[in-house]
Amino acid sequence: MEDTAKIQLSPSVEDYLKGIYTLTERGDSASTSALAQTLGVQPASITGMIKRLATLGYVEHLPYKGVQLTKNGSIEALRIIRRHRVLETYLQERLGYTWSEVHQEADLLEHAVSDKLISRMAKVLKDPTHDPHGA
């Protein structure tokens, strides 16, 4: 499917998906409080976004257990994480950013670049499997 045919997710939705994936990947509960801490937002603001993500088919909310990504949610989260890692690697290897600079810059760029650009950057980098932080 072409980039232009995909639903454009807001940076906020992408950050939530990435945050939920990160929490559940480590084996932690993706509770509203854990998610609020991970994203640096107030717990009260989490509820509305969880409902939105559930409506979009990206998460399932399990009462008293927290949030789990659906298959589609996991696919999107991994796509976003891949974008971030390719950007970090490109910024460091090709543009001379320091290790401490790449994360914040990649956080800004990951929401603004196309899948096509990420694919081309990854190709130039010989499809890296790890980011500059070793992840």
Could you tell me what each predicted segment is?
Residues 50-51:
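Short, hydrophobic-biased segments on the C-terminal half of alpha helices
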Residues 95-135:
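Anionic-ligand-binding alpha/beta catalytic cores of soluble enzymes and soluble regulatory domains
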Residues 1-40:
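Extreme N-terminal segment that seeds HTH/winged-HTH DNA-binding domains in transcriptional regulators
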Residues 54-62:
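A short, conserved structural fragment
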Residues 65-84:
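Basic, amphipathic "hinge/linker" alpha-helix immediately C-terminal to the N-terminal HTH DNA-binding motif
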